């Protein structure tokens, strides 16, 4: 089932808030299986003040965090996990391929490949204009 979630609906699922909410909308959601979200990267992002003032680049760790937030929406939409928190449990095989700069629109996709008990694994890919900018395997742990 595909669903569209705006920022207010995302905030009902995950606890992140400005300045650390890094997903603007979810355009595809298959509950407990996959999700696609978007982040409009603007020149006004707080992290560009220091990374780097003369050549602003979105930190790779924040791209991974944005992917993890989309993953949290996917896993927490599963009926048994609704109302809980998804913690970032780990990261494997992270690769950063291209810079993300002001004006870019990040497409953030995750496919949950394994859920066992309160833990899950997802394959995450971030793209800009159809080109991969980052990818990783993310691990999630569900808390109360």
From Swiss-Prot:
Cellular compartment(s): Cytoplasm
CDD domains: FabZ
Pfam families in the cross-refs: FabA
Enzyme class of the recorded protein, top EC level: lyase
Highest taxon listed in the record's lineage: Bacteria
Residues of the active site: 51
GO biological process: fatty acid biosynthetic process; lipid A biosynthetic process
UniProt keywords, alphabetically: Cytoplasm, Lipid A biosynthesis, Lipid biosynthesis, Lipid metabolism, Lyase
Transmembrane regions listed in the UniProt entry: none
UniProt main location, coarse: cytoplasm
Catalytic activity: a (3R)-hydroxyacyl-[ACP] = a (2E)-enoyl-[ACP] + H2O
Gene Ontology MF annotations: (3R)-hydroxyacyl-[acyl-carrier-protein] dehydratase activity
Enzyme Commission code: 4.2.1.59
Parts forming coiled coils: none
Cellular component per GO, a single term: membrane
Record-linked InterPro entries: FabA_FabZ, FabZ, HotDog_dom_sf
Stated family: Belongs to the thioester dehydratase family. FabZ subfamily.
Function description: Involved in unsaturated fatty acids biosynthesis. Catalyzes the dehydration of short chain beta-hydroxyacyl-ACPs and long chain saturated and unsaturated beta-hydroxyacyl-ACPs.
Protein name: 3-hydroxyacyl-[acyl-carrier-protein] dehydratase FabZ
């Amino acid at each position: 089932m595909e669903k569209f979630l705006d920022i207010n609906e995302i905030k009902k699922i995950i606890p992140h808030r400005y300045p650390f909410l890094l997903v603007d909308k979810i355009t595809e959601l298959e509950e407990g299986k996959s999700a696609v979200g978007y982040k409009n990267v603007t020149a006004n992002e707080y992290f560009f003040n220091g990374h780097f003032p003369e050549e602003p680049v979105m930190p790779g760790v924040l791209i991974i965090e944005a992917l993890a937030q989309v993953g949290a929406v996917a896993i927490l939409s599963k009926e048994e996990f609704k109302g809980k928190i998804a913690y970032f449990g780990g990261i494997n095989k992270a690769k950063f391929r291209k810079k993300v700069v002001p004006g870019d629109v990040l497409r953030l996709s995750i496919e949950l490949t394994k859920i066992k008990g309160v833990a899950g694994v997802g394959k995450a890919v971030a793209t800009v204009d159809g080109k991969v900018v980052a990818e990783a395997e993310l691990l999630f742990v569900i808390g109360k």
